[in-house]
Regions:
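Non-heme di-metal
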Residues: 1-128
Length: 128
C-alpha cells in the first residue's frame, strides 16, 4: 500500500502540482495544459514501456495493453488538440500562453520524477 512517508518527493510534488492546478480556478488554463500534455506524451511513453517489457522477455499477450495504447493514444492526443486546445485558443488567443505554461510545468515535474525513478532503480540494480 503506498504511503506518503515512502513516496519520493518528486512524485508528491507532481501530484500536488496537478491537484493545485485543477482545484484553483485562477489556474484553469494551466490545468488544461498540464492535462493536455499528458495526452500528447502518452503514445511515446506507453510505446517505451512496451519496448522495455519486450526487452525483459515479457510475452506479447502481457504487453498487449501497452501496444494497444501506443496506437490508440495517438488518436486521443490528436482529438485533445482538435476538440479542446484549438477551440479554446481560437476563442481566446490569450489563453495559449497559460496553457503552454501548464504543459511545461507538468513536463518539468514529470522529468524530475523520471530522473528520480531512474536513479532509484539504478541503485537497486547495482546492489543486486
Amino acid at each position: 500500500q503506498p504511503r506518503i512517508s515512502t513516496t519520493v518527493w518528486e512524485a508528491l510534488a507532481l501530484s500536488n502540482t496537478m491537484i493545485g492546478l485543477a482545484t484553483t480556478r485562477r489556474y484553469t488554463w494551466q490545468s488544461i495544459g498540464a492535462l493536455g500534455v499528458i495526452e500528447l506524451t502518452a503514445p511515446n511513453r506507453v510505446k517505451q514501456v512496451s519496448i522495455g517489457l519486450k526487452r525483459l522477455g515479457i510475452s506479447r499477450e502481457m504487453r498487449a495493453y501497452f501496444d494497444l495504447h501506443a496506437a490508440l493514444d495517438v488518436s486521443h492526443s490528436r482529438a485533445w488538440v482538435r476538440e479542446i486546445i484549438r477551440p479554446l485558443v481560437d476563442a481566446d488567443p490569450a489563453c495559449a500562453a497559460h496553457i503552454a505554461e501548464g504543459a511545461l510545468i507538468r513536463l518539468v515535474c514529470g522529468e524530475r520524477c523520471f530522473d528520480r525513478y531512474s536513479a532509484e532503480l539504478q541503485c537497486q540494480v547495482a546492489t543486486c
